[in-house]
Amino acid sequence: NVKAGDLGGFVEGEHNLETELSDSAWIFDDAIACGSAYVNQDSSLHNTAIACDHAYVSCGSALYGQARAEDDAYLRGAVMCGNAYASGFAQIICGPDKFKPPILSGHCKVCGSVRGNVKVCGAGAVLPGEEILNDLKDITVLISDSGRRILRGTVKDTLRPRKEHAPQKEKSKKRGMER
C-alpha cells in the first residue's frame, strides 16, 4: 500500500497516474509514466518499466524489469516482465479467470490481441491484427521463439481408477426354447 510521502518513479504529470485515495496505482523505483500514458485501478510499474505515448495500464496490471507499453497499448490485468514490449494497438487482457493473467516475458513483442491464460516469452511475437484468445483455466497457450504450443493442466491428465466388477452368475437356459 502506498502512503502519503512515499517516493516512486517518474510521472510526467497528474494525467499519467490515478490520484484517488481508493486507487493504489503506483510507479515504483525508476519506472516511468509519460506522454499520455495512464496508470490506474491498482496497477503498477516497477524497476525501469515504461508506459508512454497513449498506453493504458489498468485493472491490476504490473510491469517489471525493462517492460515497455507504448503507442495505444491497452493492458487490463496483465503482467509484463523482462524486456517484454507491447506496442501499436496491442490489447493484453485478463480473461474471466483472473487468477491466470496473460504473462509477457523475455524479449517478446505483442502488437495484436492477447486474452486469458496466454504466456508470450523468449522472442515470441503476436503480430498486428492477430488474436490469441484463451479463457480456459486448465489450458495455457504458450508462444515463444521455438513456436506455439498448448499446455494442458494436470486435471485432465489424471484418470479415475477403474471400477472392479463382480463376476456375473450365468443364467440357466431353459430347455426347449429356441433362440
Regions picked out by a protein language model, each given a short descriptive name:
Residues 38-153:
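Glycine-rich hexapeptide-repeat left-handed beta-helix
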